[in-house]
Amino acid sequence: MKRLIIIILVFMGFSAKAQTAKVAAAADMKYLMPELVANYKAKHPNATIDVSFGSSGLFYQQISNGAAFDIYFSADISYPQKLKEQGFVNGNVTTYAFGSLVLYSTSIDVSKGINVLNDEAVKKIAIANPQHAPYGKRAEECLKYYKIYDSVKSKLVLGDNITQTAQYTVTGNADVGIIALALALAPEMKSKGKYILLDTKSYNPVEQGCVLIKSWQVNPEASRFLKFVLSKECKPLFEKYGFIVP
């Protein structure tokens, strides 16, 4: 009898875990992901989707070191591709969207274009850390494309991820930020500042990829949630935040 109880408890533990999907999401999904989760839970009220937001590069390092995530949404598809090569992935890497860069400010007239960054009024420019944040790499590429990187390098303030970079700009810790369109379109950002799109020819595509992470136990909830996010039903939500869906 005691053995039967133990077996039942173990089974219940497995069932409970199967109802929870742990998601590592790129920081540019800060406003999009909660809407995706809400729509999914409307169809699957018993599901639990546990989302962590952060830098795609740092998530890559964590997953490589055994972090317990079920799904990984990366703002740079190269990171999930590396995980697949290293044997951490179930199935294929899927491109779920392309992101865009904008110049954003609450105090500077960004309609003047990228060269406004050279103005004396601009003391600090926020970008995400290029070492591990995809939007930071693209921001650096953009500055170099327009040949102003050297002249503004001393003004750069680095955020750990693109959300922190946006916050630097909104809170006045930076005069201008090069951030994701997906963040600039959020109501709380739109109400406080203005932005202009940066020419996509000035930086490499922000191709974003997602994968299911291998685990000792198959998680059907994670598979269902990922399938839902990639469905046509979710395309309007992605487009609401400026993502280009392939």
Can you say where each PLM-predicted feature lies in the sequence?
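Sec-dependent N-terminal signal peptides
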Residues: 4-14
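Exported/periplasmic ABC-transporter solute-binding proteins
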Residues: 19-43, 48, 57, 61-65, ...
